[in-house]
Amino acid sequence: MMEMITIKPGKITVQANPNMPKEVAELFRKQHYEIVGRHSGVKLCHWLKKSLTEGRFCYKQKFYGIHSHRCLQMTPVLAWCTHNCIFCWRPMENFLGTELPQPWDDPAFIVEESIKAQRKLLIGYKGNPKVDKKKFEEAWNPTHAAISLSGEPMLYPYMGDLVEEFHKRGFTTFIVTNGTIPERLEEMIKEDKLPTQLYVSITAPDIETYNSVNIPMIPDGWERILRFLELMRDLPTRTVVRLTLVKGENMHSPEKYAKLILKARPMFVEAKAYMFVGYSRNRLTINNMPSHQDIREFAEALVKHLPGYHIEDEYEPSRVVLIMRDDVDPQGTGVEGRFIKH
């Protein structure tokens, strides 16, 4: 009999599900994911493909200098999450909630197998006449890991070690988390195993909106997020708060968002539109997708409540606006500059 994970204030007990059910794994494969080990996964990013075939790129390339064609998009927790967000493009109706896998795969195994999975997905581009040979060879050897693809990555108990394994291989790393596992961040701080850039996705300005938009699977999710934001403040790494904005749902109260952002005092804030894609189309309508102008106007309203921040850049194809802290060097790299240090 499987035991359920119990998530209590300040503690996570991991027991449970030995493997991903075959029907769930098959659903992901149909969506062009490669399953890695027991619980991880890889999928080629839309912008990686566009970079190879059309020379276009992701907003993270424009904002931070990440090379879209050399990005490995992966997750160590493919089908498990603490939220059921209405805007999620993943097949969360088939997610396994917080019933976590055990035993967990080794971090080094996940990294090596993720690189192999990426190459398996890339092989079809090798003979494509639209793809530059040198660019394909670079894509074959990724240098950046976006740990964010699906599920809540911080549920993986060895996240610090996973980051370290990527860094050993010369990768830069982004983690995108919903902020509900602050104890994982505490461990990573103690171990000094932080990612190159840490994102927290904040998609509600208050607990009422949180309950209706994020539909938490845990009883104290909001309190956990507040703790996570406090831990982010003054971290010795690059930090971002990302707002995924859904028209008619969470695109209100910029002053409340600002209070949350100032708890973390991140280097960057991204105001980004919800995109009407994937499984979210079963829950929302195209009218919930803000225009770039809507996002720009919301960012302008938000920054009025963020002393020490300004609008730095925007990228219309992704409907995203970059807000940056005033003390970040717009030409610099690393923990004091706008751009990633490769």
Curated annotation (Swiss-Prot):
<dbReference type="GO" id="GO:0008033">
    <property type="term" value="P:tRNA processing"/>
</dbReference>
<feature type="domain" description="Radical SAM core">
    <location>
        <begin position="64"/>
        <end position="312"/>
    </location>
</feature>
<keyword id="KW-0456">Lyase</keyword>
<feature type="binding site">
    <location>
        <position position="58"/>
    </location>
    <ligand>
        <name>[2Fe-2S] cluster</name>
    </ligand>
</feature>
<dbReference type="InterPro" id="IPR013917">
    <property type="entry name" value="tRNA_wybutosine-synth"/>
</dbReference>
<keyword id="KW-0963">Cytoplasm</keyword>
<feature type="binding site">
    <location>
        <position position="71"/>
    </location>
    <ligand>
        <name>[2Fe-2S] cluster</name>
    </ligand>
</feature>
<keyword id="KW-0001">2Fe-2S</keyword>
<feature type="binding site">
    <location>
        <position position="81"/>
    </location>
    <ligand>
        <name>[4Fe-4S] cluster</name>
    </ligand>
</feature>
<dbReference type="Pfam" id="PF04055">
    <property type="entry name" value="Radical_SAM"/>
</dbReference>
<dbReference type="GO" id="GO:0046872">
    <property type="term" value="F:metal ion binding"/>
</dbReference>
<dbReference type="InterPro" id="IPR023993">
    <property type="entry name" value="TYW1_archaea"/>
</dbReference>
<keyword id="KW-0411">Iron-sulfur</keyword>
<feature type="binding site">
    <location>
        <position position="85"/>
    </location>
    <ligand>
        <name>[4Fe-4S] cluster</name>
    </ligand>
</feature>
<feature type="binding site">
    <location>
        <position position="45"/>
    </location>
    <ligand>
        <name>[2Fe-2S] cluster</name>
    </ligand>
</feature>
<dbReference type="GO" id="GO:0005737">
    <property type="term" value="C:cytoplasm"/>
</dbReference>
<dbReference type="GO" id="GO:0051539">
    <property type="term" value="F:4 iron, 4 sulfur cluster binding"/>
</dbReference>
<keyword id="KW-0819">tRNA processing</keyword>
<dbReference type="InterPro" id="IPR007197">
    <property type="entry name" value="rSAM"/>
</dbReference>
<comment type="similarity">
    <text>Belongs to the TYW1 family.</text>
</comment>
<protein>
    <recommendedName>
        <fullName>S-adenosyl-L-methionine-dependent tRNA 4-demethylwyosine synthase</fullName>
        <ecNumber>4.1.3.44</ecNumber>
    </recommendedName>
</protein>
<feature type="binding site">
    <location>
        <position position="88"/>
    </location>
    <ligand>
        <name>[4Fe-4S] cluster</name>
    </ligand>
</feature>
<keyword id="KW-0949">S-adenosyl-L-methionine</keyword>
<dbReference type="GO" id="GO:0051537">
    <property type="term" value="F:2 iron, 2 sulfur cluster binding"/>
</dbReference>
<dbReference type="InterPro" id="IPR034556">
    <property type="entry name" value="tRNA_wybutosine-synthase"/>
</dbReference>
<dbReference type="InterPro" id="IPR013785">
    <property type="entry name" value="Aldolase_TIM"/>
</dbReference>
<dbReference type="GO" id="GO:0102521">
    <property type="term" value="F:tRNA-4-demethylwyosine synthase activity"/>
</dbReference>
<keyword id="KW-0479">Metal-binding</keyword>
<keyword id="KW-0004">4Fe-4S</keyword>
<comment type="subunit">
    <text>Monomer.</text>
</comment>
<keyword id="KW-0408">Iron</keyword>
<dbReference type="Pfam" id="PF08608">
    <property type="entry name" value="Wyosine_form"/>
</dbReference>
<comment type="function">
    <text>Component of the wyosine derivatives biosynthesis pathway that catalyzes the condensation of N-methylguanine with 2 carbon atoms from pyruvate to form the tricyclic 4-demethylwyosine (imG-14) on guanosine-37 of tRNA(Phe).</text>
</comment>
